[in-house]
Regions:
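Short active-site oxyanion
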Residues: 1-2, 32-35, 69-71, 116-121
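Short, well-structured N-terminal submotif of metal-dependent ribonuclease cores
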Residues: 1-41, 47-65
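Acidic, PIN/NYN-like endoribonuclease modules and their adjacent C-terminal/linker elements
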Residues: 3, 112-149
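Alpha-helix capping/helix-boundary segments
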Residues: 10, 41, 79, 111, ...
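General small-molecule cofactor/ligand-binding pocket signal
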Residues: 36, 73, 140-142
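Phosphate- and divalent-cation-binding pockets in alpha/beta enzyme and binding domains
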Residues: 44, 82, 132-133
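Cytochrome P450 catalytic domain signature, combining two hallmark sequence patches
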Residues: 52-57, 91-92, 140-142
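Active-site neighborhoods of divalent-metal-dependent phosphate/nucleic-acid chemistry enzymes
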Residues: 71-121, 125
Length: 149
C-alpha cells in the first residue's frame, strides 16, 4: 500500500476554505492508515500559527493524532545531505541565489527527500518547486487529493 505525506499547503488551504477542509477531511479519513506527518510540515504549521487558541487547536486536532499513532517522520542525515547537494546543483545550473531563496523552498527539499526515503507520495499543490527539486533527485508527488489504490 502506498504511503502519503501531506504538505503544509494542504492544511493551510483547509484552514481558509470550508470546501478545502471537507476535501482534506475526506482524504484523511480514507487514507488514515497510510498517512504520515513530517516534522518539517509540523514546524511550518506551528510557525504560521499566531494566536494561542489557534496553536492549541492545531496541536490537538491536526498534529496530536499523528504523534499518538507514531506516524511522524523526521529528516534524516541523508535528507540534510540532499538539501546541500540540491542547493549546490541549483546554484550551479539555475543560478539560484541562496540569500534570496525562501525558507519554504528549503523545507520543500527536506520534505521531498524524507518522502523519498519513506517511499511515500508527497501530496502538495506546489508542483513548481517540486519540479525544480526533481532535477536533482526523484520522488513521488501528487496534487491534492489522489485516489487511493
Amino acid at each position: 500500500m502506498r504511503k502519503f505525506v501531506l504538505d503544509a499547503n494542504c492544511f493551510i488551504a483547509a484552514s481558509r476554505s470550508d470546501d478545502e477542509a471537507a476535501l482534506l477531511e475526506m482524504f484523511v479519513q480514507r487514507a488514515a492508515s497510510r498517512l504520515y506527518l513530517s516534522t518539517v510540515v509540523a514546524a511550518e504549521l506551528r510557525a504560521g500559527t499566531n494566536r494561542i487558541g489557534d496553536l492549541r487547536k492545531l496541536e490537538k486536532v491536526v498534529l496530536k493524532p499523528y504523534y499518538k499513532r507514531g506516524r511522524v517522520i523526521n529528516p534524516s542525515a541523508a535528507a540534510w545531505d540532499a538539501l546541500g547537494k540540491t542547493l549546490a546543483w541549483l546554484v550551479k545550473n539555475e543560478g539560484l541565489i541562496l540569500r534570496m531563496t525562501p525558507r519554504s523552498f528549503i523545507f520543500d527539499i527536506l520534505l521531498a527527500y524524507s518522502c523519498r526515503e519513506l517511499g511515500a507520495v508527497l501530496i502538495s499543490a506546489n508542483e513548481r518547486d517540486f519540479q525544480r527539486i526533481r532535477q536533482v533527485f526523484a520522488f513521488d508527488s501528487a496534487p491534492p487529493y489522489p485516489h487511493l489504490d
